[in-house]
Amino acid sequence: MWLHFDVMANILCHIRGTKRFKVYPPTDITKLSFLPSASSSTIENPFDPELEPDGVHPMETVLKPGDVLFIPELWPHAAYPLEPCVAVNVFFKSLEHGYSSGKDVYGNKDLAAYEKGRTMIGRISKGFERLPSAARRFYMERLADELANMATDG
Protein backbone atom coordinates (compact mmCIF):
# COMPACT_ATOMS: atom_id res chain seq x y z
CA MET A 1 0.00 0.00 0.00
CA TRP A 2 1.16 3.50 -0.76
CA LEU A 3 2.46 5.91 1.86
CA HIS A 4 -0.37 8.24 2.83
CA PHE A 5 -2.00 10.00 5.78
CA ASP A 6 -5.58 10.24 6.97
CA VAL A 7 -7.04 13.41 8.45
CA MET A 8 -9.02 11.39 11.00
CA ALA A 9 -7.67 8.86 13.48
CA ASN A 10 -8.61 5.26 12.84
CA ILE A 11 -8.27 1.75 14.17
CA LEU A 12 -6.99 -1.01 11.91
CA CYS A 13 -8.34 -4.44 12.86
CA HIS A 14 -6.19 -7.11 11.25
CA ILE A 15 -8.17 -10.28 10.54
CA ARG A 16 -6.19 -12.59 8.25
CA GLY A 17 -2.63 -12.89 6.95
CA THR A 18 0.43 -10.92 7.97
CA LYS A 19 1.65 -7.54 6.82
CA ARG A 20 4.40 -5.10 7.59
CA PHE A 21 3.12 -1.75 8.76
CA LYS A 22 5.16 1.44 8.89
CA VAL A 23 4.12 4.74 10.47
CA TYR A 24 5.87 8.11 10.68
CA PRO A 25 5.22 11.00 13.08
CA PRO A 26 3.59 14.09 11.51
CA THR A 27 6.84 16.02 12.03
CA ASP A 28 8.36 13.94 9.19
CA ILE A 29 5.79 15.14 6.60
CA THR A 30 8.13 17.61 4.84
CA LYS A 31 10.73 14.87 4.28
CA LEU A 32 8.36 12.24 2.87
CA SER A 33 7.72 13.62 -0.64
CA PHE A 34 4.11 14.73 -0.29
CA LEU A 35 3.20 17.16 -3.06
CA PRO A 36 1.06 20.18 -2.13
CA SER A 37 -2.58 19.18 -1.72
CA ALA A 38 -1.77 15.45 -1.80
CA SER A 39 -2.38 12.94 0.98
CA SER A 40 -0.25 10.30 -0.76
CA SER A 41 3.54 10.39 -1.04
CA THR A 42 5.47 10.07 -4.28
CA ILE A 43 7.84 7.57 -2.61
CA GLU A 44 7.22 4.41 -4.64
CA ASN A 45 8.10 1.87 -1.95
CA PRO A 46 8.34 3.14 1.63
CA PHE A 47 9.66 -0.28 2.69
CA ASP A 48 12.75 -0.03 0.47
CA PRO A 49 15.63 1.17 2.70
CA GLU A 50 17.31 2.75 -0.35
CA LEU A 51 14.33 5.11 -0.74
CA GLU A 52 14.07 6.08 2.95
CA PRO A 53 14.70 9.83 3.26
CA ASP A 54 17.31 11.05 5.73
CA GLY A 55 16.12 12.39 9.06
CA VAL A 56 12.81 10.51 9.31
CA HIS A 57 11.65 8.56 12.36
CA PRO A 58 9.61 5.55 11.21
CA MET A 59 8.15 2.92 13.49
CA GLU A 60 7.50 -0.51 12.02
CA THR A 61 5.68 -3.65 13.10
CA VAL A 62 4.29 -6.86 11.62
CA LEU A 63 0.54 -7.25 12.01
CA LYS A 64 -0.92 -10.73 12.59
CA PRO A 65 -4.52 -11.95 12.85
CA GLY A 66 -6.20 -10.43 15.90
CA ASP A 67 -3.90 -7.41 16.09
CA VAL A 68 -5.51 -3.99 16.45
CA LEU A 69 -3.54 -0.84 15.67
CA PHE A 70 -4.51 2.74 16.49
CA ILE A 71 -3.38 5.16 13.75
CA PRO A 72 -3.48 8.80 14.93
CA GLU A 73 -4.71 11.48 12.55
CA LEU A 74 -2.08 12.95 10.20
CA TRP A 75 0.48 10.17 10.80
CA PRO A 76 1.81 9.01 7.40
CA HIS A 77 1.66 5.23 7.11
CA ALA A 78 1.91 2.31 4.69
CA ALA A 79 1.28 -1.43 4.71
CA TYR A 80 3.08 -4.21 2.88
CA PRO A 81 1.26 -7.56 2.83
CA LEU A 82 3.51 -10.58 3.33
CA GLU A 83 0.66 -12.83 2.19
CA PRO A 84 -3.02 -12.29 1.26
CA CYS A 85 -4.60 -10.20 4.04
CA VAL A 86 -7.95 -9.01 5.30
CA ALA A 87 -8.24 -5.95 7.55
CA VAL A 88 -10.92 -3.45 8.51
CA ASN A 89 -10.37 0.22 9.35
CA VAL A 90 -12.78 2.19 11.52
CA PHE A 91 -12.41 5.98 11.42
CA PHE A 92 -13.18 8.38 14.27
CA LYS A 93 -15.34 11.28 13.07
CA SER A 94 -13.31 13.91 14.92
CA LEU A 95 -14.05 16.71 12.45
CA GLU A 96 -17.35 18.40 11.78
CA HIS A 97 -19.24 17.83 8.53
CA GLY A 98 -17.87 20.09 5.80
CA TYR A 99 -14.26 20.07 7.04
CA SER A 100 -12.98 19.19 3.55
CA SER A 101 -13.44 21.01 0.27
CA GLY A 102 -15.37 18.05 -1.18
CA LYS A 103 -16.66 14.57 -0.38
CA ASP A 104 -14.18 12.58 1.72
CA VAL A 105 -14.96 8.87 1.49
CA TYR A 106 -11.62 7.58 2.82
CA GLY A 107 -10.80 10.15 5.53
CA ASN A 108 -7.72 11.48 3.74
CA LYS A 109 -8.90 14.63 1.97
CA ASP A 110 -7.13 17.79 3.08
CA LEU A 111 -8.95 20.33 5.22
CA ALA A 112 -10.81 23.11 3.41
CA ALA A 113 -8.83 25.67 5.46
CA TYR A 114 -5.57 24.25 4.06
CA GLU A 115 -6.84 24.40 0.47
CA LYS A 116 -8.03 27.98 0.99
CA GLY A 117 -4.64 28.87 2.51
CA ARG A 118 -2.82 27.43 -0.52
CA THR A 119 -4.92 29.66 -2.79
CA MET A 120 -4.11 32.71 -0.65
CA ILE A 121 -0.38 31.87 -0.67
CA GLY A 122 -0.52 31.71 -4.47
CA ARG A 123 -2.01 35.21 -4.57
CA ILE A 124 0.55 36.53 -2.08
CA SER A 125 3.37 35.01 -4.13
CA LYS A 126 2.18 36.83 -7.26
CA GLY A 127 2.56 40.12 -5.39
CA PHE A 128 6.31 39.46 -5.14
CA GLU A 129 6.88 38.38 -8.77
CA ARG A 130 8.23 41.72 -9.99
CA LEU A 131 10.73 42.21 -7.18
CA PRO A 132 14.41 41.42 -7.62
CA SER A 133 15.08 37.81 -6.59
CA ALA A 134 17.05 38.74 -3.44
CA ALA A 135 14.22 40.97 -2.14
CA ARG A 136 11.57 38.43 -3.14
CA ARG A 137 13.36 35.65 -1.25
CA PHE A 138 14.06 37.88 1.79
CA TYR A 139 10.43 38.94 2.26
CA MET A 140 8.84 35.62 1.37
CA GLU A 141 11.09 33.84 3.89
CA ARG A 142 10.07 36.40 6.52
CA LEU A 143 6.41 35.68 5.78
CA ALA A 144 7.03 31.92 5.92
CA ASP A 145 8.72 32.34 9.30
CA GLU A 146 5.79 34.41 10.60
CA LEU A 147 3.37 31.73 9.43
CA ALA A 148 5.43 28.98 11.10
CA ASN A 149 5.45 30.99 14.34
CA MET A 150 1.67 31.35 14.19
CA ALA A 151 1.39 27.56 13.93
CA THR A 152 3.45 27.01 17.09
CA ASP A 153 1.91 29.87 19.07
CA GLY A 154 -1.56 28.37 18.65
Tell what function each PLM region has:
Residues 1-67, 78-154:
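Active-site region of the double-stranded beta-helix
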